[in-house]
Amino acid sequence: MMNNKDAIYIAGCGGMLGEAFYKVFENSYHLKCTDISVNEKWISSLDFRDYDEYRRDVKEFKPNYLVHLGAHTDLEYCETNQEDTYITNTLAVENAVYITNELKIPIIYISTAGIFDGKKDTYDDWDIPN
């Protein structure tokens, strides 16, 4: 029973940002927090890079919002593992958008523009980083 609380699905919740989201929202919302690495009792195992599993899990939970936090952030890892980084940081985000469009719910996505020079208002996957 959700006690009339909105439901939020948080993908990629195993890091510091995910824990901060959990602490802020745990008492006000019905949460499902997932990550590939389960390091807390409130996190369920899910690899959001697997579109079918991600879609199924989100649809079963029936959230009002989807928060997608997961990404590779270690620049050295990203440079040496470009295919995995692309799958994780780009394709999985696109899949999250497809899922939210299908369910007609908002997506909340947090990323960084810290690798760019700040001269443009918006950036895309093809902009050259610093």
What are these regions (language model features)?
Residues 2-28:
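N-terminal Rossmann NAD(P)H-binding glycine-rich loop of SDR-like oxidoreductase domains
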Residues 11, 34, 66-70, 107-113:
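SDR active-site strand-loop-helix element
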Residues 16, 29-40:
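Conserved glycine-rich Rossmann-like NAD(P)H-binding loop of the short-chain dehydrogenase/reductase
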Residues 29, 61, 99-103:
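Helix C-cap/helix->beta junction micro-motif
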Residues 36-52:
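Rossmann-fold cofactor-recognition segment
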Residues 48-88:
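NAD(P)H-binding glycine-rich loop region in Rossmannoid oxidoreductase-like domains
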Residues 80-108:
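NAD(P)-cofactor binding segment of oxidoreductase domains
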Residues 87, 91-95, 114-130:
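Catalytic helix-loop patch of NAD(P)-dependent Rossmann-fold dehydrogenases
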